[in-house]
Design a protein with these regions (language model features):
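Interfacial helix-start motif at the membrane-water boundary
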Residues: 47-54, 58-62, 71, 75
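Membrane-embedded alpha-helical hairpins and interfacial helices in multi-pass inner-membrane proteins
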Residues: 27-35, 43, 63-160
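Small-polar-interrupted transmembrane alpha-helices in polytopic inner-membrane proteins
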Residues: 19, 23, 61-66
Length: 160
């Protein structure tokens, strides 16, 4: 049992570190925040299909990334909540991989626009931000996440 706990903790920590690293990489190119967001780290949101440790790993990774990027507290709280909800939904839909991509896309598309509008006061409307955030999520989570899923699924017996 102790080995499984250590393995679970290690997997979660590695996923959190990857999430932070990919978010910081996106920040270097100005893709991680603002009206149009393309967080490369969101591709990792498919990982709960393979690993239960991905749920806390993604959540902690998002929390740390938001703190390290200097986001305001409401973004840290609600952005992390959106990631947690998406990760839990993905885990629950792990036997339906195409549907498993939807929870993180939907949670971020619904929650993040309110943060952009009311916490940051960015010019634009909630529906506009739903469109822009949703598009970014479709690319990062839907497209890149699907590519990651296809790659990992071929080798899941060796990896997991």
């Amino acid at each position: 049992m102790k080995h499984n706990n250590t393995k679970h903790l290690t997997q979660g920590a590695v996923i959190a570190a990857l999430y932070v690293a990919l978010t910081l990489l996106a920040k270097v190119f100005g893709l991680d925040s603002g009206q149009i967001q393309l967080r490369l780290s969101e591709a990792l949101c498919i990982l709960p299909v393979f690993l239960p440790a991905a749920v806390p790993g993604l959540t902690v990774g998002c929390l740390l990334a938001n703190l390290l990027c200097g986001n305001i507290i409401w973004d840290v709280v609600f952005g992390t909540l959106a990631t947690l909800l998406g990760a839990v939904g993905t885990r629950l839909l792990r036997n339906r991989p195409l549907l498993a991509l939807l929870p993180p896309i939907l949670s971020n598309t619904v929650i993040v626009p309110f943060v952009l509008t009311y916490a940051y006061g960015l010019p634009g409307t909630v529906p506009f931000f739903m469109l822009t955030v949703g598009l970014g999520e479709l690319i990062s989570c839907g497209l890149l996440g699907r590519l990651l899923y296809n790659t990992l699924d071929k080798h899941k017996n060796q990896l997991f």
